[in-house]
Design a protein with these regions (language model features):
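N-terminal Rossmann-like or analogous alpha/beta NTP/dinucleotide-binding catalytic cores
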Residues: 1-108
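Active-site cores that bind ATP or allylic diphosphates and position pyrophosphate for catalysis
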Residues: 85-172
């Protein structure tokens, strides 16, 4: 539970609008969806006075670091990502480089803050494992810079969607 984590960690929560544009979306609705995501998180109990909540695209260093991390990330690692394979099947008409390198941007989102504990659902564990691998490769090449982030799984690591077939999504 993110609200409880605020008592144990210095928490940073990112509204990931760049991740959201890797699949089809309506640009004219994005601002509304960003505000809605912020409102939902605050309504769920995240206190902006006790944690940081921000919009990914407002911090250009996220994409700058992602670009640098791309240079140490083997293509084969990205090709094996389960979520890329699943999303590619769901969005056949829009399989793009952003979707392919999504995990590298996610790693940048974590590593830019030297994140050590990352709350994720079980479907994201593979992404955290890749993030650790990217951090290690970067550290070997450029010197000790990033920690090895570890996933923190919730008590309910996967919440099913209303259709009972797929997981619930918090996508913008």
């Amino acid at each position: 539970n993110w609200v409880r984590m605020i008592d144990q960690y210095d928490c940073i929560f990112c509204i990931v609008d760049y991740h959201a544009i890797t699949i089809d979306y309506k640009p004219e609705e994005m601002q509304k969806r960003i505000l809605n995501a912020a409102a939902v998180n605050i309504a769920a109990g995240l206190d902006p006075n006790r944690c940081i909540i921000f919009v990914q695209s407002h911090v250009p260093e996220h994409t700058e670091l992602a670009w640098i991390l791309n240079t140490v990330t083997p293509m084969g690692h990205l090709e094996r990502m389960t979520q890329f394979k699943d999303k590619s099947k769901q969005h056949r008409e829009n399989i793009n480089a952003g979707l392919f390198t999504y995990p590298v941007l996610q790693a940048a989102d974590i590593l830019i803050y030297k994140g050590e504990a990352v709350p994720v659902g079980e479907d994201q564990v593979q992404h955290i494992e890749l993030c650790r691998e990217i951090a290690r490769k970067f550290n070997m090449r450029y010197g000790e810079t990033f920690p090895d982030p570890m996933e923190i799984l919730s008590e309910a690591p996967r919440i099913m969607g209303l259709d009972g077939k797929t997981k619930m999504s918090k996508s913008l």
